[in-house]
């Protein structure tokens, strides 16, 4: 039982517990008590002790010199003592823990893996032989400041010298104050100096940190301590180390002299940091060290005069792990990122990257978060010394990029968004990588949006421009501006829903003209003409579009099914501007020209009605699937759609395309995306879906199949396509559309789509994907997929027409000779993709991917290698082959170049990656489930 000391604490913060031996001042200082006392401070400042029941004989007062490390007390009749061997110094351990203190390293709270609980195993690393588990103790969660907290003391024996004001304790000595606890074999507490000396098996515990040593000095009023021959453990961070001595400051900061730091297990020193002065700050979660060597198996491999490293997952300013690499275009590269932890709600990162062939790329980003907004601002600049592209069109040697992504809620209904990126030249992302998270597609967005959400409507103002990030695409239309208002009336007379959709948008763009200059300075040839300059007729138009779409429907829903009849009217008004070349193309008298018979109208319009009837039923029954109890559903659906034909050949195509056919196409009101074409339809779509659902809600299997029956040809097509030349536009039926999903369990999944053309007796498109990744062992990943698609409707940049032809160019030139630039099946998709990460042995895993294009008989990407993973470090070595897209010509056949590389990644857990961080990029992009694997890994 602890006795709490009141006002006396300020002078000498000592509280004496049961089993503590104390001597009254009246006794001789050389006598020994044969009974125990409960003591507390008297009103005069002395001790007031009451005797307890007699117990067994206590050992005599320990006799030791001030410099002694530890002395073993014998019985009262002992006449001689045996000299103990000198302790092993931590400097002799070479990064390992001292087995001399405990062969099983239990002195560091190390618990073997087979003795961990299920919860502790979940927190431990997958390849760790155990974990540091802090034992429960009184007051471990106490956050009271030391100067406001009493001290509790317990020991098997004690002695107090009134004249010197020294209390001597022996046997399982424990001092506890607030959340800090110190243990030792022996202790001397000096009341006048408010300090203590502890000897033998010293343990200091505080805020998830344990420091073990042979001898310690403790300042009793503020918790400052020095522990000699020290080892330490930080339980949550799973790190340990040692030092000639360790100092604990009043602020709980730990300073180590000749200290080490590692995340490796106590008996392992695969790697560790060693520095003259090491500082660990649990309050900030970071440490620093000076004159540091990184040692692998005690061999120094790296030196730095200063290092700043994390000891937990909190953010803090400092250098992030560097990245080294080589490439044919950049040469040797070194990136040394620096992170600025400016405030809890905003930070910044600088990414200086030195490239031997190009120079120094300075890239950085600033991120922010407020109660109503979030976003990031980034930028980069490089004075490019690589002159390979200096003759190419639109190239700039002063390379730059800046971006701003922002979201802000102006109130509960109004949302503002910005996504703006600009680049110096269209080759920027082909030559340079970015760490700012910008999606490097064929263009970058320059968009600002205001969205207002009412109770029954949504209004949006959008300003959207594009900056091309390549030279082989046609300049897209900017929407400057786009205004939409969609919703329904707030009343429902007779159960009717009155809906409306409105849009106004202005389309504008600046077309390139003239000829492209390639990297050799060659230009002026027909194939060098910019694709923008090859546009003809209405494809060169810009203008404005106003679209109105009122509708009324009667949704009827029951537990067993639904019926929804709907009527709409779609009206679109245009204001079209066309340059002289476009008007001249429309005036052609050539019947073979796609613009023959098309008149230029400055204000074309279109109005067309739409009727649809959607209906479905729902049935279910209890059944079994492979011995499992399930509820099977049967959900037939019928959808009738009628849209009359309206001639739309005089309307330009601004933002419209034709999506590829799928099961979802059966239920669409318009087979085109965008509003420049409203497809004529007179069809009935029939489909059925069946699901197998287990009692816990797990969907084991799902199967859908459907087909559309056409009563009229689909005459409305994209510009340049004659419906009479498209078999699928004149067929009476659509392809059979199938979708299938089966989950073998929560880890195994198989999904497939399949579209079969009954007229051609051929597959239009299909896919099959197998994915395996166990929840309880995400280190295992298997992906096997196949995709086939031969029904893509695309705009052919070379000919300037819409087409379904999958080839690039024509097989022959105008003179009948073979076309050297012709590429068969260039746009056809016929690929398999296989990837795997699989453990071969404990700690060893195979990593591989193979993506192959059957249409062009070539490997798109292939890599293979291995991974070694231990408790404290990881290594990956991967050999990779891939197709690199680097635009040097308008001819796609010259822009695909194979490349190869061997990639090494080393990760020192607790420090981050040392080399090869870029390996993460292609593993994340190439292997489904890789990110989940890394996120769930310890």
UniProtKB/Swiss-Prot annotation:
Record's GO cellular component terms: cell outer membrane; transporter complex
Biased composition (Low complexity): 65-81
Signal peptide start and end residues: 1-33
Gene Ontology annotations of biological process type: Gram-negative-bacterium-type cell outer membrane assembly; lipopolysaccharide transport
Superkingdom assignment: Bacteria
Gene3D superfamilies per record: Lipopolysaccharide (LPS) transport protein A like domain (2.60.450.10)
Region (Disordered): 52-96
Keyword Cell wall biogenesis/degradation among record annotations: no
Keyword Membrane: yes
A Pfam family annotated for this UniProt entry: LptD_N
Subunit structure: Component of the lipopolysaccharide transport and assembly complex. Interacts with LptE and LptA.
Family indicated by similarity: Belongs to the LptD family.
Name of the protein in its database record: LPS-assembly protein LptD
Lineage: Bacteria, Pseudomonadati, Pseudomonadota, Gammaproteobacteria, Pseudomonadales
Recorded name of the encoding gene: lptD
């Amino acid at each position: 039982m602890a006795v709490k000391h009141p006002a006396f604490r300020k002078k000498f913060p000592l509280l004496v517990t049961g089993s503590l031996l104390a001597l009254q001042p009246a006794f001789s200082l050389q006598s020994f008590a044969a009974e125990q006392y409960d003591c507390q401070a008297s009103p005069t400042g002395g001790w007031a002790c009451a005797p307890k029941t007699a117990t067994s004989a206590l050992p005599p007062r320990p006799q030791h010199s001030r410099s002694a490390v530890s002395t073993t007390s014998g019985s009262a009749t002992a006449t001689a003592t045996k000299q103990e061997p000198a302790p092993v110094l931590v400097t002799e351990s070479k990064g390992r823990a001292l087995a001399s203190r405990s062969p099983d390293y239990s002195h560091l709270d190390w618990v073997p893996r087979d003795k961990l609980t299920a919860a502790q195993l979940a927190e431990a690393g997958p390849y760790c032989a155990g974990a540091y588990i802090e034992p429960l103790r009184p007051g471990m969660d106490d956050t009271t400041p030391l100067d406001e907290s009493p001290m509790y003391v317990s020991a098997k024996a004690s002695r107090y010298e009134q004249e010197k004001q020294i209390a001597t304790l022996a046997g399982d000595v424990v001092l506890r104050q607030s959340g800090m606890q110190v243990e030792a074999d022996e202790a001397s507490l000096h009341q006048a100096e408010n300090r203590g000396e502890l000897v033998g098996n010293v343990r200091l515990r505080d805020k998830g940190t344990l420091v073990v040593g042979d001898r310690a000095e403790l300042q009793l009023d503020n918790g400052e301590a020095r522990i000699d021959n020290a080892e330490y453990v930080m339980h949550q961070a799973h790190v340990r180390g040692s030092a000639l001595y360790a100092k604990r400051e009043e602020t709980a900061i730990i300073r180590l002299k000749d200290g080490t730091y590692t995340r490796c297990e106590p008996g392992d020193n695969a790697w560790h940091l060693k520095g003259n002065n090491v500082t660990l700050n649990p309050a900030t979660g970071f440490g620093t060290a000076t004159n540091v060597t990184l040692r692998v198996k005690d061999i120094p491999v790296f030196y730095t005069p200063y290092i700043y490293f994390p000891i937990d997952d909190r953010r803090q300013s400092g250098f992030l792990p560097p990245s080294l690499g080589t490439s044919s275009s950049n040469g040797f590269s070194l990136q040394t990122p620096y992170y600025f932890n400016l405030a809890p709600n905003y930070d910044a990162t600088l990414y200086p990257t030195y490239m031997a062939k190009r120079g120094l790329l300075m890239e950085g980003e600033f991120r922010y978060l407020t109660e109503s907004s979030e976003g990031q601002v980034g930028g980069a600049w490089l004075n490019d010394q690589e002159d390979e592209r200096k003759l190419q069109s639109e190239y700039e040697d002063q390379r730059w990029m800046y971006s701003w992504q922002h979201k802000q809620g102006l109130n509960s209904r109004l949302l503002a968004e910005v996504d703006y990126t600009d680049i110096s030249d269209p080759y920027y992302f082909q030559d340079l990588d970015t760490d700012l998270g910008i999606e490097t597609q064929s263009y970058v967005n320059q968009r600002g949006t205001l969205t207002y959400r009412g109770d029954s409507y949504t209004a949006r103002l959008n300003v959207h421009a594009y900056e091309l990030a390549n030279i082989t695409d046609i300049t897209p239309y900017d929407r400057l501006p786009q205004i939409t208002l969609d919703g329904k009336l707030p009343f429902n007379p007779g159960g009717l829903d009155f809906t409306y959709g409105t849009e106004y948008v202005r389309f504008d763009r600046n077309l390139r003209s003239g000829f492209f200059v390639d990297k050799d300075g060659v230009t002026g040839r027909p194939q060098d003409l910019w694709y923008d300059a090859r546009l003809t007729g209405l494809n060169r138009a810009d203008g404005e579009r106003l679209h109105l779409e009122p509708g009324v429907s009667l949704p009827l829903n029951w537990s067993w099914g639904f019926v929804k009849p709907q009527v709409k009217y779609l009206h679109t008004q245009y204001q079209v501007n066309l340059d002289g070349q476009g008007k001249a193309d429309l005036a052609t008298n050539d019947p073979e020209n796609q613009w023959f018979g098309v008149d230029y109208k400055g204000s074309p319009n279109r109005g067309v009605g739409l009727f649809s009837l959607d209906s479905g039923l729902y049935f279910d029954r209890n059944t079994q699937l492979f011995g499992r109890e399930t509820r099977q559903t049967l959900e037939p659906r019928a959808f009738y759609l009628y849209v009359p034909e309206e001639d739309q050949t005089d309307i330009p195509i601004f933002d419209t395309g034709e999506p590829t056919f799928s099961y979802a196409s059966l239920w669409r009101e318009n087979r085109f995306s965008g509003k420049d074409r409203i497809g004529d339809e007179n069809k009935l779509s029939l489909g059925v879906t069946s699901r197998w659902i287990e009692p816990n809600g797990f969907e084991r299997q799902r199967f859908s199949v459907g087909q559309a029956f056409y009563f009229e040809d689909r005459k409305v097509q994209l510009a340049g396509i004659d419906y009479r030349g498209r078999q699928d536009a004149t067929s009476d039926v659509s392809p059979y559309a199938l979708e299938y999903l089966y989950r073998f369990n929560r880890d195994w999944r198989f999904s497939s789509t399949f579209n079969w053309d009954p007229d051609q007796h051929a597959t239009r498109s299909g896919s099959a994907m197998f994915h395996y990744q166990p929840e309880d062992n995400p280190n295992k990943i298997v992906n096997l997929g196949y995709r086939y698609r031969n029904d893509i409707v695309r705009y052919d940049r070379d000919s300037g027409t819409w087409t379904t032809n999958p080839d690039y160019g024509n097989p022959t030139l105008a003179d009948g000779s073979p076309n050297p630039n012709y590429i068969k099946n260039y746009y056809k998709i016929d690929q398999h993709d296989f990837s795997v990460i699989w453990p071969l042995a404990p700690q060893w895993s195979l990593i591989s991917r193979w993506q192959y294009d059957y249409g062009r008989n070539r490997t798109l990407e292939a890599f293979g290698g291995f991974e070694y993973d231990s408790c404290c470090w990881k290594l990956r070595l991967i050999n990779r082959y891939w197709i690199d897209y680097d635009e040097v010509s308008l001819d796609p056949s010259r822009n695909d170049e194979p490349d190869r590389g061997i990639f090494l990644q080393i990760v020192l857990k607790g420090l981050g990656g040392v080399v090869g961080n870029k390996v993460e990029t292609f593993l994340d992009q190439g292997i489904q489930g890789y990110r989940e694997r890394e996120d769930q890994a310890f």
